[in-house]
Amino acid sequence: MQAKTFLLGAALAGVALAAHAEDGTIVITGTITDQTCTIEDPSPGYIKVVHLPTISKSALKNAGDVAGRTRFDIKLKDCPTTVNTLKLYFEPGPTTDYGTKDLKAYKQAWYVDAATLLKSPPSVTEAKGVQIRLMNLNGKQIPMGETEPNQHAAAFSGTMQAGQAKKSFTLHYLAGYVKKASGEVEATMLTTYVGFSVVYP
């Protein structure tokens, strides 16, 4: 910030400056495909609500303990027959804890008004001692904040839709409570969220 302020001041004073040296270059690549699917039975805004069971805080005694594992499914239909497998990429966002690779949990109850709930989670108080973890069905953590290849989210095969030259897919994952490394788990209602994108081969 100081360097930028200095350069601006020098330009206003009419001092000629040489172009600044670069330390490196970041090359960003990507691919957009026209092979798309439709999410089955979405709620407004494609919001999927996962209700974790009510558990005792004694189930989360030690750092890394996971409890209340709950499966959730994302169903896709009308996919091209050329698509063999699909998986999800969980997008980084305000709820991402880049240290633990889990989702921050907030002391706020879920309610029907999703637009209000998702407006600004950090404006509410973060829960102590506990976060929410996303996992594959084998229980292995899907690390939040990582690149898509490094999340290692499981991919699933599709099935042909009856009477149509299209496929359907059901993607299965787990969510659960996880004990943080520090702080006692407090008894409270919790809410978090994460955006996702479907990854096409």
Curated annotation (Swiss-Prot):
Residues 1-21 form the signal peptide. Its main location: other. The keyword Signal applies. InterPro entries: Adhesion_dom_fimbrial_sf, Adhesion_dom_sf, Bact_Fimbrial_Adh_Pro, FimA-like. Disulfide bonds join C37-C79. Bordetella pertussis is the causative agent of whooping cough. An essential step in the disease process is the attachment of the bacteria to the ciliated epithelium of the respiratory tract, enabling the organism to resist normal host-clearance mechanisms. It is unclear which bacterial cell surface component are responsible for adherence but the fimbriae of B.pertussis are prime candidates for being involved in this process. This is Fimbrial protein FimX. It comes from Bordetella pertussis (strain Tohama I / ATCC BAA-589 / NCTC 13251).
